Structures are given as C-alpha cells and as structure tokens.
C-alpha cells in the first residue's frame, strides 16, 4: 500500500528512493565471455577504460537517490568484493547509507548455494527484512546503461503496482536470450515468457520483441510473500524470470516500465543505451564504441557520473623512442599510468598502466590493466586480459588459423588472449 499522500512527482522522486533498498545480483559467471571470466565474476569485468561493469548499477543507484544497496555475490567473488571495498566504502553508515556485501553462505541451513536469482534473495531474507524498506529494487549487476530508478519508482507507485518490470524493444532474432512480454495499452503485462525459442513480436512491429531488462521493483511485503511461496513450490527453479514473474503476470499484478521513461541521456536524439555485454563480440564492440566521436553512451555527463575505484596514477604519456619515432593515438581511450613509446594506437581502449613499447601497431583492440606489449608487435581486433606480457614481434589478429591454435578466436573474429594461453606458447 502506498503511504505517501503527496503525489507530486518531484516530491516522490526524493521520497521513494529513501524508502527503497536496491539488491544487485552480482553472482553470475558470464560463461559466454570465455576465459575473461575464469577468475572473476562477470560484474567485476573491466569496462570502458577504467570501470568495472558493476559500477554502472551502483552509480545508477546513487544518482537516483538510493543509498541503501545490497550486492549479492557467489561465483569468483574476491575481485568483486575487493573492488567494492576499495571504491564504494565512502557511504555514511551513520546516515543509514551503505553498500552491503551478501555472499552465498548457506544462511538458511540448506545444503546448497544460490540455486537461482529468487533463491539468492530468499537466502538473505532475514537481512533484507532488517533494512525495513517499503520497496525493493532488484537489479542485474552485469549490464551497461544509465537509468534513473526514481522515475521507475514513481511509475510503480502511480500505477498501484505490486511488481514493475523494466523493458525495452530488442530485435526479435535476439530476443530468445531474454524474458519477453506482451502488454496491453496501459502496460499491464499479459504474458511473460523466459527465453522463448519463438519470441512473440511487438504489435505493429514484427521484427522486434519487448524484452525484460532484468530490473524489477516490488512492494517489499509482496516480495517476501512471493519468495516464501516459491520456496515451497515443487518444481520451481527459484528464478525471477522463469518462476516469479510468470506467476505474478498470471495474477494480473505485474506492470511494464518502458526504459525510454527513465533512460538517462545527454543527447535525446540518440536511442536509449542498454547493453548486455555477455559475449566477446558484444564486450569488444561496446568498449570500442566509447572511442567513437559521438558514442551512444556519454561517459562525460557531469550530471550522471559513473563512479569507480580511483587509483593514484600519473597521466598517460606518449613519447618518442630512441630512433625518434613518436608515440601517437587516434580515436582511442587511454587511461592513467599508460605509456605509449614510438607506436601507433588506433581505435582502441587502453586501461590503466598499459605499456606499449616501440614500433607497435595497436588497432581496434582492448588492453586491460597492466598489459605490456613488447616491441614490434601488431595487434588487431583483440582483447588482451589483465597483466599479459605480449612477446616482442608477436602478431595477433591477422591470421585466423594461427590465432585459433594459440588463443581463443570467436566466430566474429575477436581474439581473446590470457596469461594462461601465453604461458603455453
């Protein structure tokens, strides 16, 4: 039941986030990213030159006014926990502000870890109840987007909803990777199908389907009741998309929230930006898109900053080598602590402390932190994992057969290089 008598949107935008807690589901492995997630959870994967993927959901919370956040972790959580402790410990607990880490601990005397997204929330129910929130915002920690959750909260309250699901149109041939819904003219969800083999099209647009973004808002008491019921339901997989949302839809209690209503953009002429960087191609492309002249995702928007752990690094440096060749870059992102010596970097992303030695050409490549590229190397359409040392004279990305033998080459021709792969050469 809505307790706010004042329905003024500006007032609600201030009040509703204060009465809310956000739970970020950050335990996913991200297996489609191959060896990039062999030692880290997908939300902890580096993105955009200096960030981690989870920084986007966390920053959206703070910018939306939600300052009570739980992060639910499981798979390979050390890197993620370390990042949050170092970069997100500035909130004031005395003001009831926090980022609370909730690792899988078999808290309910069960013999299993988190079995599904709903089970991950259920196993922390005693902690979540103590937050004493009126609304619970469930978020995925592995997507790239900027969104004002307070606008979705207002939509949730104004509709009198028990559950609200954020949604956006996606190409129908890609929709089988998402939960897909059908809605009426008032955005009431009529049907919800999790990853259907034949996704239903949107009315009047046969090439598009309406997909769930994995973002849900629940009235807290209603959510707690649902979770209790789901845990005692035979055959349930204890997953929001597979079990809870279809059940709520059947009860006519789930509403859709179009992403266009809460998407944050500095250029309204650009389409709403949301990316599931779950494959190597998608991850590579989303990183390089940021180096374009006018990227769809504006990382320079002071009104909606993306926060992260900031290391005390010197500025990037471009120097000439002993022969006089100058280090130079074009259409690229180069982070602090990088040194490019007598080499050319084109349309690439260099994370902190990358060193590119003389006579190299780096083209359309993502270099994660602490990579060292030896002299006279050529790298094209690559993702080089953290702390890799590329031997002098190595060429990657020009010979598909050779790349497939030494490294991992995706169907789209993106080459992933890790330290383990290099150690076997």
Curated annotation (Swiss-Prot):
It catalyses: alpha-D-glucose 1-phosphate + ATP + H(+) = ADP-alpha-D-glucose + diphosphate. Coiled coil: none annotated. InterPro entries: ADP-Glc_PPase, ADP_Glu_pyroP_CS, GlgC_bac, GlmU/GlgC-like_hexapep, NTP_transferase_dom, Nucleotide-diphossugar_trans, Trimer_LpxA-like_sf. Keywords: ATP-binding, Carbohydrate metabolism, Glycogen biosynthesis, Glycogen metabolism, Nucleotide-binding, Nucleotidyltransferase, Transferase. CDD domains: ADP_Glucose_PP, LbH_G1P_AT_C. PANTHER family: GLUCOSE-1-PHOSPHATE ADENYLYLTRANSFERASE, GLUCOSE-1-PHOSPHATE ADENYLYLTRANSFERASE-RELATED. Homotetramer. This is Glucose-1-phosphate adenylyltransferase. It comes from Serratia proteamaculans (strain 568). The gene is glgC.
């Amino acid at each position: 039941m809505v307790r706010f008598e004042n329905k003024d949107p500006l007032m609600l935008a201030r009040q509703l986030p204060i009465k809310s807690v956000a739970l970020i589901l950050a335990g996913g492995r991200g297996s489609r990213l191959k060896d990039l997630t062999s030692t880290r959870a997908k939300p902890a994967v580096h993105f955009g030159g200096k960030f981690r993927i989870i920084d986007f959901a966390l920053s959206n919370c703070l910018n939306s006014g939600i300052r009570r956040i739980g992060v639910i972790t499981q798979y390979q959580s050390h890197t993620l926990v370390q990042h949050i402790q170092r970069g997100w410990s500035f909130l004031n607990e005395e003001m009831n502000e926090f980022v609370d880490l909730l690792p899988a601990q078999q808290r309910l005397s069960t013999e299993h870890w988190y079995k599904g997204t709903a089970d991950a929330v259920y196993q922390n129910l005693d902690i979540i109840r103590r937050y004493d929130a009126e609304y619970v915002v469930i978020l995925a920690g592995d997507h790239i987007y900027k969104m004002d959750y307070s606008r979705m909260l207002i939509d949730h309250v104004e509709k009198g909803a028990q559950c609200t699901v954020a949604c956006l149109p996606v190409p129908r041939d890609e929709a089988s990777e998402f939960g897909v819904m059908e809605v009426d003219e008032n955005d009431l969800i009529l049907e919800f199908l999790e990853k259907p083999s034949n996704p239903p099209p949107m009315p009047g647009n046969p090439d598009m389907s309406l997909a769930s973004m994995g973002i849900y808002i629940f009235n807290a008491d209603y959510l707690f009741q649902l979770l209790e019921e789901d845990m005692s339901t035979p055959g349930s997989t204890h997953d929001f998309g597979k079990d809870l949302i279809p059940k709520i839809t059947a009860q006519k209690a789930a509403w859709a929230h179009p992403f266009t209503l809460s998407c944050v953009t500095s250029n309204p002429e650009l389409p709403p930006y949301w990316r599931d960087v779950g494959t190597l191609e998608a991850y590579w492309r989303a990183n390089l898109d940021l180096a374009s002249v006018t990227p769809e995702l504006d990382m320079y928007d002071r009104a909606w900053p993306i926060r992260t752990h900031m290391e005390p690094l010197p500025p990037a440096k471009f120097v000439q080598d002993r022969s006089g060749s100058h280090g130079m870059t074009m259409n690229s992102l180069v982070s602090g602590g990088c040194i490019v010596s007598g080499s050319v970097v084109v349309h690439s992303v260099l994370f902190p402390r990358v060193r590119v030695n003389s006579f190299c050409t780096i083209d359309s490549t993502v270099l994660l932190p602490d990579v060292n590229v030896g002299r006279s190397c050529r790298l094209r359409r690559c993702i080089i994992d953290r702390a890799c040392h590329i031997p002098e004279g190595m060429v990657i990305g020009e010979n598909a057969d050779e790349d497939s033998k030494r490294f991992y080459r995706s169907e789209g021709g993106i080459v992933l290089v890790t330290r383990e792969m290099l150690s076997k050469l």
